[in-house]
């Protein structure tokens, strides 16, 4: 780059003082353009070089596992205790269920049993607020929330779960995967609030697994499980395992058909695959894996 700058200096500066006003203007504009291009090229080279030289992580999963996997489900849908949890229990797989107290109260005894059996109960707010661009969320739109209102709601949800199930939630899932409150210049992220109140916060419809040596536990990526075949999910698993990452799958209904439904056939195939020691997968609930990461990464 120094050579290029020197060349420009030789070509233009020596004649600059003899140029008319228009020529000087065009020359300056040309030099600005060249410097901009060279700067962008230099940055690109540095970025690529940095990517190539990233140090290898010394993070390792327990018992020589090559990746971690968590199955998570939202909203305390009725199909979860009716059909999904018995299937998970059949294979000894522990999942995380992010519940809203209103839905949970329809099957309190079943949710108590699930918690006692090692499934994690997480916080998913009281009202399930999302952007008001969803008409069903207009009366509880995130655009109308304040941080104080959100903090009160999340605390209320945790208190209700504690009162009804005897569980202190340490994991949270952002409703609709949205992490903002307010509008325009008054928009605020409530990720710091979640980081203060919980061990982890899970997103929704993300495109990558989580690097245990780097990920922000308050903003965990989660890939959709709803509507997926085992073959489709297996590709996500293979990607995560190649990097030693943590794949979080997120779903809603646990049934054989319907909208926002994680297929029982897919879940069963996942369980069988994940518990096979040859596949090198640590499958566990979000809390257990997040806690391990928090205590073991440098």
Regions found by a protein language model. Name each.
Residues 3-46:
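Bacterial Sec-dependent N-terminal signal peptides
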Residues 69, 246-248:
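Residue-level preference for the first positions of well-ordered beta-strands
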Residues 47, 54-63, 103-106, 198-213, ...:
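C-terminal domain-boundary segment and adjacent tail
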Residues 40, 180-182, 256-261:
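A generic structural signal for short coil/turn motifs at secondary-structure boundaries
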């Amino acid at each position: 780059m120094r050579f290029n700058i020197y060349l420009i200096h030789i070509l233009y500066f020596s004649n600059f003082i003899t140029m008319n006003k228009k020529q000087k203007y065009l020359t300056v504009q040309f030099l600005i353009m060249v410097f901009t291009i060279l700067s962008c090229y230099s940055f690109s080279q540095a970025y690529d070089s940095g990517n190539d030289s990233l140090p290898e992580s010394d993070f390792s999963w327990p018992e020589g596992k090559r990746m971690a996997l968590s199955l998570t489900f939202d909203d305390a849908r009725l199909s979860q205790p009716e059909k999904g949890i018995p299937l998970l229990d059949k294979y000894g797989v522990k999942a995380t269920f992010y519940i809203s107290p209103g839905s949970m109260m329809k099957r309190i005894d079943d949710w108590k049993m699930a918690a006692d059996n090692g499934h994690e109960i997480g916080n998913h707010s009281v009202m399930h607020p999302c952007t008001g661009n969803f008409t069903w969320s207009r009366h509880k739109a995130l655009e109308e929330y304040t941080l104080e209102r959100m903090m009160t709601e999340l605390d209320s949800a945790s208190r209700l779960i504690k009162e009804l199930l005897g569980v202190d939630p340490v994991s949270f899932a952002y409703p609709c995967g949205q992490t903002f409150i307010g509008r325009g210049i008054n928009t605020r992220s409530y990720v710091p609030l979640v980081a203060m109140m919980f061990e982890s916060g899970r997103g929704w419809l993300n495109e990558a697994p989580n690097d245990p040596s780097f990920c922000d536990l308050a903003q965990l990526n989660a890939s959709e499980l709803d509507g997926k075949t085992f073959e489709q999910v297996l590709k996500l698993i293979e990607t995560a395992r190649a990097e030693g990452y943590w794949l979080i799958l997120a779903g809603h209904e646990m049934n054989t058909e319907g909208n926002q439904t994680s297929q029982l056939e897919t879940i069963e195939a996942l369980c069988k695959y994940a518990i096979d020691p040859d596949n090198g997968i640590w499958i566990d609930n979000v809390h257990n894996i997040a806690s391990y990461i928090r205590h073991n990464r440098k």
